[in-house]
Design a protein with these regions (language model features):
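Short, solvent-exposed loop/hinge segments that bridge or flank secondary-structure elements
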Residues: 22-53, 75-87, 105-106, 110
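Edge beta-strand at a domain terminus
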Residues: 59-67, 96-114
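Sec/Tat signal peptide C-region and signal peptidase I cleavage site
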Residues: 16-20
Length: 114
């Protein structure tokens, strides 16, 4: 009976997608001109963004939904101020991984680990 319970528990754990392991932490973001845009911090289901521009409306906090290949921005200043909907994990030749921040129309920022 214990073996069946152990096997069932292990199967349930391996079937669930990994959450927040690959995108959690601090990310240095650059805009389309490669100028420094700010710092993105993701922990759990929340994010914070600090813009390099004073009084920028995109600075602030909000909530996210994590996926295997990135995050969805549910609310907060990045969503309302910059219309950013998603952050996708992509391979990066220098840092290994990066997050590209996207609106519905375009990629607007690239963030690399700090």
């Amino acid at each position: 009976m214990r073996r069946i319970a152990l096997i069932a528990a292990l199967a349930a754990l391996t079937a669930t997608p990994a959450f927040a392991q690959n995108f959690t932490g601090n990310w240095a973001c650059r805009d389309a001109t490669t100028a420094k845009a700010g710092i993105l911090t993701i922990y759990g289901e929340v994010y914070g963004f600090a813009s390099t521009t004073a009084n920028d409306g995109s600075s602030g906090t909000g909530t996210i939904t994590g996926y295997q290949d990135g995050v969805s921005f549910n609310d907060g200043n990045l969503r309302t101020g910059k219309a950013i909907q998603a952050g996708r994990i992509i391979p990066d030749p220098t840092y290994g991984t990066a997050i590209q921040l996207e609106t519905a129309e375009a990629i607007v920022m690239l963030c690399t680990p700090r």
